[in-house]
Amino acid sequence: DVSASGNFGTKDQFKRELATEIAAILAFSAIKNNDKVGVIFFTDKVEEFIPPKKGKKHILRIIREVLAFQPSRKKTDISEALEYFNSVIKRRSICFILSDFISAPFEKPLRIASKKHDLVALRIHDRRESSLPNVGLVPIQDAETEEMIFIDTSNKKIRLDFVKNRLDKINAVKKLLPNVGVDLIDISTGNDYIKPLINFFKGRGKKR
């Protein structure tokens, strides 16, 4: 997910920077296992697709693209990426979806993909996205639509409504993913992401 909502962060790094680091680690791990690796960059459309291949040269190309990629659009539509993935990847694969999952509905293509492939959702988020500090009247701009509104954060009801709306969306995603057989890893900016990844894969190894 290379949409504009990734350009948010309040503790040392943006969400997109965190996603980039994780994508690079996952790609490097494929070298050791001699796995094929591909990548789909998406916003509200598929921006670029690098088909799966083996080899260090190919992996390094993917990492260069991940580090330097500049999307042409700002919005997010995960369903577009999933539909494209379903159409171009025929063999059963492990698919890591790195996104904040702030998107238009995507349940239908997710269900289709999860029946054929092994999906892992890495929800990249920042803790400040789920809170609104009491600092008076502040401008808030949607990174994807560029719409700007002013919010009176001194109003307790407004702060509570903001938090509730945000948590409702997060909980909806957390409920949907396991219901369709998709594993979820929650990773926040400013926190160690190596340990959650290691714990996740260790847990998977035990299940198998």
Locations of regions flagged by a protein language model:
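Von Willebrand factor type A / integrin I
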Residues: 84-94, 105, 109-208
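A conditional alpha-helix N-cap/helix-loop micro-motif detector
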Residues: 20, 74-78, 166
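Von Willebrand factor
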Residues: 57-93, 105-106, 126-127
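An amphipathic, basic-hydrophobic helix/alpha-beta surface used to engage anionic
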Residues: 2-52, 84, 94-96, 104, ...
